[in-house]
């Protein structure tokens, strides 16, 4: 018997169709091809004037005068999480606009002219793009310079974060959805938080954190050290996805308290689906005897 991992399932599979969350949890690995962390390309935003972008930044983490919360998401998974938590019917009085990596904007929820709350989301990564390195576009750099919230995965997944925030003058709140920013958190969280006090932006790790696992693979050819100390692909576990969704929901509630009930109900519904997904995954794997399991995967993340 052969166990095909979730990321390799057919998109039209009845099992996957049962769960709206499957596109994020099960199919996401196709967005991250294998890449050495040392192969970073220069960020496109470095060509911009950092002082000019910094002048656009602000430190507010709640809705501005127009009642708009501006958010940026680093990965496709986080972009999908936020979309599912913020997408509601017109009765919610929440207007939500999501701009993808292709620059196209989609509208969800209440009519913008009638809504009492507004949320805009800029998604940095495109499908099939590496989550480790990213060249910011001019529009993305501008969005980050004005953002109230910058949602990231953490556990050292996104190597481009420092360059992105430094070059844009980001002064909002970086929400670490996994609850673990990186290996430094594991080594000495108190010391890491002390260092962050000097940063021009705040860091919010939420109330929950994922269970980090040591990176099981040896160094790549020609390298003396492994690419990671801990496995950053945390969202491939539904249990870890629950942590991320919970932390995202809490951050959105804090930024737009008048929509707290909407976000909370969407988080509860999403978590319920993730729990069912976890049960299905465990049952599927356990149906094959352990000594006969063969794993086919497109990435070293499962």
Where are these regions (language model features)?
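Extracytoplasmic metal-acquisition and chelation regions
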Residues: 25-26, 42, 55-302
């Amino acid at each position: 018997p052969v166990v095909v991992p979730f990321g390799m399932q057919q998109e039209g599979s009845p099992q996957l169709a049962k769960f709206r969350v499957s596109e994020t949890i099960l199919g996401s690995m196709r967005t991250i091809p294998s890449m050495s962390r040392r192969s970073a390309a220069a960020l496109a935003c470095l060509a911009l004037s950092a002082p000019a972008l910094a002048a656009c930044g602000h430190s507010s983490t709640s809705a501005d005068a127009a009642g708009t919360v501006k958010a940026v998401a680093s990965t496709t998974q986080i972009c999908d999480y936020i979309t599912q938590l913020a997408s509601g019917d017109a009765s919610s009085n929440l207007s939500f606009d999501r701009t993808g990596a292709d620059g196209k904007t989609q509208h969800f929820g209440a009519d913008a002219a009638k809504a009492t709350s507004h949320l805009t989301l800029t998604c940095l990564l495109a499908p099939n793009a590496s989550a480790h390195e990213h060249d910011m576009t001019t529009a993305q750099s501008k969005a980050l310079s004005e953002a109230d919230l910058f949602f990231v995965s953490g556990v050292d997944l996104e190597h481009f974060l420092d360059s992105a925030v430094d070059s844009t003058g980001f002064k909002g709140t970086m929400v670490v959805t996994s609850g673990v920013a990186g290996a430094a958190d594991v080594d000495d969280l108190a010391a890491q938080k002390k260092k962050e006090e000097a940063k021009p932006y705040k860091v919010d790790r939420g109330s929950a954190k994922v269970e980090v696992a040591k990176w099981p693979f040896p160094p790549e050819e020609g390298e003396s050290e492994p690419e990671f100390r801990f496995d950053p692909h945390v969202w491939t576990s539904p249990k870890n996805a629950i942590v991320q969704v919970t932390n995202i929901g809490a951050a959105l509630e804090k930024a737009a308290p008048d929509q707290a009930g909407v976000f909370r109900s969407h988080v509860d519904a999403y978590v319920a689906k993730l729990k069912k997904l976890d049960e299905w995954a465990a049952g599927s794997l356990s149906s094959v005897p352990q000594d006969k399991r063969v794993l086919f995967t497109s990435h070293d993340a499962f």
